[in-house]
Amino acid sequence: MTLKNLFFDLDGTILESSRGILNSFRYTFDEMGHPQLSDAELNTFIGPPLEATFETLAKGDDAWAEKAIVTYRKYYAAKGMLEAEPYDGILEMLENLQQHDYKLFIATSQKEDVAQNMLAGLKLSQHFKGIFGNTPQAHSKTLVLKKSLDLTQSTPNTSAMIGDREYDIIGGQENKVAKTIGVLWGFGDETELKNAGSDILIAHPQQLLEIIR
């Protein structure tokens, strides 16, 4: 069946947001007395839900993890999200897809209101029919995508999930979407996306329209 609904990850797919995310982790570690980590280590935290990352770092200390999440989000909302910008070619890709009548949505592990504010601040909100993210009821990529599909009444067999990390691909598979599309300009790599079972890999935003038409 023809694809009609395209669900995009946000960080590493639409936005180059690494500087703000890494700075938010550094601030949180300083505030929480946690040793600083290398940029390479911090980059692995981009994509998974924040709760999972801090639960791992907390090593069983739930109170520490909860406080760290609050600290991170406070900094990110005030400063970190302002440091993001769309990748080269993203705006043109979104406009081309809209001209071909695809319905575009965001399905991100970012906190939902933060994702909405980021895209509004970057004047990108108008390209999306819905912006869905992490909420207490939906905190994994699989659950966020399920919520997105349900609320938009999008059928999985006419939908695709597009993202840069294995979580995006797995989320798409677990929701039985027609295609999972891995992007190579973000924070994952070809090996990660292939191992996750991505149906298609693209290296530049403009390739998306070519491969789904």
Place the predicted regions along the sequence by residue:
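Surface-exposed amphipathic alpha-helices with a cationic face
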Residues: L91-Q98, L149, I169-E174
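Conserved H-loop
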Residues: P35, S125-K129, T155
